[in-house]
Structures are given as C-alpha cells and as structure tokens.
C-alpha cells in the first residue's frame, strides 16, 4: 500500500531518496543538498509530497501555491516516481493528493508542464483530468557573465 504525506522538513531518509530519484527526472540538475531540500520542504509556498510503500520512498512531488492579483495559482513541479514503482498508481496518488491540497488552499486550477517525451506521464495527466492549454511556455536563462552569453 502506498501512503502519501507532506514533508515538513528534510530527513536523512528523504535526502537519500532524492539522491536516487532526481537523476531519474533530470540529468542536468543535481539532487539537492540536505539544506536545499530542507528549504524546499519548509518554504511557505511549497508542499512537498512524499509517496512511500513497504520498500521506502517511491515518489515525490512539489506543489507550489501562491497568490497573484487574479487569484490563487497552483503549480505542480518535479513529479518523480521511482523507475521500480512506475505503473503502480504512485503518480496518480501523488497528483490527486496535490490537487486536493491546492483546492483546499483556494486554487481553482492546477497547472503543470511535462516534456512530450515523457509519454506515460502525459497519458497519466490526461487520465487524471489535466487538459493541454493553448499557451506557450517560455524560459529565460540567467546570462553567464563569464562567457558574455
């Protein structure tokens, strides 16, 4: 059975799990240090969801909820389900818990992005009820002053 909780701070167990899980999501971003993870868990806008089963931590999700002039905005970020736990409903449980939590904080929509290459994840999001938005997503990178670019 999978249990989903919200971490209120970093622990050695959670930090070790992130060292294993983050590389499964991104090869360009290193796993967080213990202090970085603790800051994420404790940040007032964040809820850091942790899925565990009898084997240990099998997935995580970050929900960010913040007020803007047009309402309460909610974003799901960094959904990671351990390769060994995929296809067992962990991603669905994490997302459903986050959506319920966001609505409880006053959000009326929840957004997320997912690379097209993550086909299984995109199918899951659509089955849950997420819809593709008619919008563009842009990213601005901090210039590297050492190279002038």
Where are these regions (language model features)?
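Conserved acetyl-CoA-binding loop-helix of GNAT-fold acetyltransferases
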Residues: 81, 87-100, 123-127
């Amino acid at each position: 059975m999978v249990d989903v909780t919200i971490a209120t701070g970093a622990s050695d167990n959670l930090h070790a799990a992130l060292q294993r899980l983050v590389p499964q999501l991104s090869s360009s971003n290193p796993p967080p240090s213990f202090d970085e993870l603790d800051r994420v868990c404790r940040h007032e806008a964040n809820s850091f969801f942790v899925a565990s089963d009898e084997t240990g931590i099998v997935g995580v999700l970050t929900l960010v909820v913040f007020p803007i002039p047009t309402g309460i905005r909610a974003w799901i970020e960094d959904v990671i389900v351990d390769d060994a736990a995929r296809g067992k409903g962990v991603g669905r449980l994490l997302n459903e818990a986050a959506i319920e939590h966001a609505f409880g904080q006053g959000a009326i929509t929840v957004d997320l992005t997912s690379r097209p290459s993550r086909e299984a994840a995109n199918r899951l999001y659509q089955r849950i009820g997420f819809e593709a938005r008619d919008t563009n997503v842009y990213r601005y990178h901090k210039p590297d002053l050492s190279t002038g670019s």
